[in-house]
């Protein structure tokens, strides 16, 4: 960190229309699915729209997505679409007359794997068939977001029941979620419902990324790519590690995944609550070193579901995630079902800008270089050199001309102090044409990387490679000036290819 002094705390940041480098993911729901509200969220700073398939039908989500497309068209703001799978869940069963039951501390209760029974104070059911085989006396069962703790006393496989003691007094409703901390659960990462959601809704709708719930090992991602088949190339996989098994296998998951989500909700039931900060820092640090985008999620501005201002702890939590190195911060209930979705995005955006202004980007750059094994790949060497050049020349912007977006993502890995304009260049096929992007996918994929601003440009391309590059670069700089990213007289670092050679150059904005 840098720039920490009393004057820095007292002075306001200049109100020059700056946008945060950190990206904002918003979960869409009842509070945020109309066209006017989606336009407000896009203008406030939403970069990724999350569709949570734990709730809602395909028709419901389709209506929301159609509205989002209209809002994007109206505002001319690009937004990526994320499908978040429900994943393999264990839930408690239905209750007699549908009424919640009262559990008392010290009372014993039987848990059955027969999901057809209607539960009461003596017996409840759970949806996991192998519960009796996987649990042993002394294990813990957490129900309803951890509000109820049951300790296993004995297991009876023939009858399919587990005898438990209740450790606290609480009320249990129907179909509440269940966690089994430390137990290796034999459930597929991709359930039949998930496959249906992805193949029947996600693929036809050209979604950009899938957030996979409860990823436990690297092979889970290999299997999901098999399910996606030919679509695996254009849909990014974002892994959510939500249990101990996933934490233990973190390195192999990171190798296989495209990006990552620190989903602190379920993880907080699986590991002690006082260790969550440690897991968050470890995951973000490793993602940063691997150059893979990471999203920090769950309860970031939770109180804003009902209140127009976040708690001090929440504001600090968002800022600390930025200081840890997260690429994106996420809103869940705040934007999906809260009373102040637009305000939540605006406040989150302001906190991110403030946190970013206190970062020591040069120290981060040096740490990245120190931790990257040699020899670097030619592309990585180029990307890091572009950032070093921008830091030394005090450039105001880095412009990257890229085909698939991977060069721009590598530049983002080295965390320059300035924004990165990622211009996705179409492949030249004819002598001259109006260049516009045939496929926006690479541009939308870059919306989860800190500091990356994708540009979909139009202009005319000349016959030769170097001439066309100059035209594209000129158009990109014009667009950057219009957006307020730089002004005439500023130095800008450009990174692009000419033929088979890669070039880094410093241009002065005209």
Swiss-Prot record:
One biological process term in Gene Ontology: glycolytic process
InterPro entries: Pyr_Knase, Pyrv/PenolPyrv_kinase-like_dom, Pyrv_kinase-like_dom_sf, Pyrv_Knase-like_insert_dom_sf, Pyrv_Knase_AS, Pyrv_Knase_brl, Pyrv_Knase_C, Pyrv_Knase_C_sf
Site entry: Transition state stabilizer: 240
Broad enzyme group: transferase
List of residues binding K(+): 52, 54, 84-85
Compartment(s) of residence: Cytoplasm
Catalytic activity: pyruvate + ATP = phosphoenolpyruvate + ADP + H(+)
Keyword entries, A-Z: ATP-binding, Cytoplasm, Glycolysis, Kinase, Magnesium, Metal-binding, Nucleotide-binding, Potassium, Pyruvate, Transferase
CDD domains from the UniProt entry: Pyruvate_Kinase (cd00288)
Residue intervals passing through the bilayer: none
SUPFAM superfamilies per UniProt: Phosphoenolpyruvate/pyruvate domain (SSF51621), PK beta-barrel domain-like (SSF50800), PK C-terminal domain-like (SSF52935)
Family (UniProt): Belongs to the pyruvate kinase family.
Protein name in the entry: Pyruvate kinase, cytosolic isozyme
Lineage: Eukaryota, Viridiplantae, Streptophyta, Embryophyta, Tracheophyta
């Amino acid at each position: 960190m840098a720039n920490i002094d009393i004057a820095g705390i007292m002075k306001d940041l200049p109100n020059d229309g700056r946008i945060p480098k950190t990206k904002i993911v918003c979960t869409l729901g009842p509070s945020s699915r109309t066209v006017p509200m989606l336009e407000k969220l896009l203008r406030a700073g939403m970069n990724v729209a999350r569709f949570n398939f734990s709730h809602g039908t395909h028709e419901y989500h389709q209506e929301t997505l159609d509205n989002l497309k209209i809002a994007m068209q109206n505002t001319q703001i690009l937004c990526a679409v994320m499908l978040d799978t429900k994943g393999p869940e264990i839930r408690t069963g239905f209750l007699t007359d549908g009424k919640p039951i009262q559990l008392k501390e010290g009372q014993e209760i039987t848990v059955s794997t027969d999901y057809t029974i209607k539960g009461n104070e003596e017996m409840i059911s759970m949806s996991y068939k192998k519960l009796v085989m996987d649990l042993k006396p002394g294990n813990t069962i957490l129900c309803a977001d951890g509000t109820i703790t049951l300790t296993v006393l004995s297991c009876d496989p023939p009858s399919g029941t587990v005898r438990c003691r209740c450790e606290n007094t609480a009320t249990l409703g129907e179909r509440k979620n269940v966690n089994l901390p430390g137990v290796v659960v034999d459930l597929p990462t991709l359930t039949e419902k998930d496959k249906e959601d992805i193949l029947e809704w996600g693929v036809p709708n050209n979604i950009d990324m899938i957030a996979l719930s409860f990823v436990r090992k690297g092979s889970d991602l290999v299997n999901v790519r098999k399910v996606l088949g030919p679509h695996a190339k254009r849909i990014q996989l974002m892994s959510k590690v939500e249990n101990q098994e996933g934490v233990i296998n973190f390195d192999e998951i990171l190798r296989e995944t495209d990006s990552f989500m620190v989903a602190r909700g379920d993880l907080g039931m699986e590991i002690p609550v006082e260790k969550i900060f440690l897991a968050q820092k470890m995951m973000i640090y490793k993602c940063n070193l691997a150059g893979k985008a990471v999203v920090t999620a769950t309860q970031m501005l939770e109180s804003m579901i009902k209140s127009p201002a976040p708690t001090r702890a929440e504001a600090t939590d968002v800022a600390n995630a930025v200081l840890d190195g997260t690429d994106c911060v996420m809103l869940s209930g705040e934007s999906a079902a809260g009373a102040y979705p637009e305000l939540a995005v605006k406040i989150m955006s302001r906190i991110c800008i403030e946190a970013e202004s206190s970062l020591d980007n040069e120290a981060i750059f040096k740490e990245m270089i120190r931790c990257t094994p040699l020899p670097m790949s030619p592309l990585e060497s180029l990307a890091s050199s572009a950032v070093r050049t921008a830091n030394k020349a005090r450039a105001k912007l880095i412009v990257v001309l890229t085909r698939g977006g991977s060069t721009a993502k590598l530049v983002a890995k080295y965390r320059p102090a300035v924004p990165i304009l990622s211009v996705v260049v179409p492949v030249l096929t004819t002598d001259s044409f109006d260049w516009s992007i045939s496929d926006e996918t690479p541009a939308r994929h870059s919306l989860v990387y800190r500091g990356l601003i994708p540009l979909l440009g139009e202009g005319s391309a000349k016959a030769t490679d170097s001439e066309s590059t100059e035209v594209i670069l000129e158009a990109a700089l014009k667009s950057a000036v219009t957006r307020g990213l730089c002004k005439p007289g500023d130095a800008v670092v450009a990174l692009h290819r000419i033929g088979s050679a890669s070039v880094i150059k410093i241009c002065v904005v005209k």
